[in-house]
Amino acid sequence: MAHKKAGGSTRNGRDSNPKMLGVKRFGGERVLAGNIIVRQRGTHYRPGENMGMGRDHTLYALIEGKVKFIRKGPKKRNFVSIEPLEESQP
């Protein structure tokens, strides 16, 4: 009878699913209300004007407009805001 000894167990062999983090809309791009701008862990980017932040720190637009990235404050923190589109009047 052919016999094969038992192989040792391994401690590798698992991997987590990708989380698709990062900037989704860049500076100057037009966005609609509700569009996701940044998906992140923690607050690398902070919400500025016309921006909302979800409980997982996702930043999203509250109004239609253009995305603007700025650094401000004494610690030069990154803020993302939405500039409203200017209405052209005839």
UniProtKB/Swiss-Prot annotation:
Organism classification? Bacteria, Pseudomonadati, Pseudomonadota, Gammaproteobacteria, Legionellales
Q: Which GO terms describe its biological process?
A: translation
* HAMAP family the record matches: Ribosomal_bL27
Q: Which InterPro entries match?
A: Ribosomal_bL27, Ribosomal_bL27_CS
Q: Write down the SUPFAM superfamilies for this protein, in alphabetical order.
A: Ribosomal L27 protein-like
A single Gene Ontology CC annotation of this entry is: cytosolic large ribosomal subunit
Q: One GO molecular function term?
A: structural constituent of ribosome
* Family statement: Belongs to the bacterial ribosomal protein bL27 family.
Tell me what organism the protein belongs to.
Answer: Coxiella burnetii (strain Dugway 5J108-111)
Keyword entries, A-Z: Ribonucleoprotein, Ribosomal protein
Q: Does the keyword Ribosomal protein apply?
A: yes
Q: What is this protein called?
A: Large ribosomal subunit protein bL27
Q: Where is this region: Disordered?
A: 1-22
